[in-house]
Amino acid sequence: MKAVLAKRVHSGRADLTEFRELAAAAGYEIVGEITQTRAEDTAHHFGQGKVTEIAELVARTDAETAIIDNEVGPYQMFNIGRILPGETEVLDRFTLILTIFGQRAQTRKAQLQVELAELRYQLPRASAKTSLAKRDERPGFMVLGDY
C-alpha cells in the first residue's frame, strides 16, 4: 500500500529515518514525505496550509494512507481525514506500531492483546467522529443529549 508520511516538530529539524523504517516494516511503500516546524494547531495538528499540501500529495501519488509521526487527537484525526481525498486512511504513530504488532503476533493470546489495545485506542476516536458527524443534527439551542 502506498503511503505519505507527515511529521510536525515544534522546533529544530524533523528526522523521518526511524518513522520511514516503521512504515516499511508495516508493509507500506512510501511515496512522499512532508514535514512542518511549528507549534501544534488545535484543529488539524498541522497548519491548515500544510494539511492541504498533504492532501495534494496524497492525490498526486495515489496514496491510500497518510501516516502522521505524532500523537494526533481524535478531533484532529477527524479534521485531517475530512480534508484528505476520498477514502484516504489516516494513521498516527501509535496505530502504525499496533499494526506492526498485529502482523507479527503469533499466538492467539498475543493477537487478542493487540486487538484489545486497538479497540481501546479507537474508542475515543469513534466517539469523537460520531459527535462531529452528528453535530448538525442536534435541533435547537443548548439541546441536551450526547452521542
Residue ranges of predicted features:
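N-terminal accessory targeting/assembly segments
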Residues: 1-99
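Alpha-helix boundary/interfacial micro-motifs
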Residues: 44, 81, 86-88, 104, ...
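Short amphipathic alpha-helical patches
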Residues: 46, 57, 81, 103-106, ...
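Flexible nucleotide-interacting loop at or near the entrance of a catalytic core
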Residues: 108-147
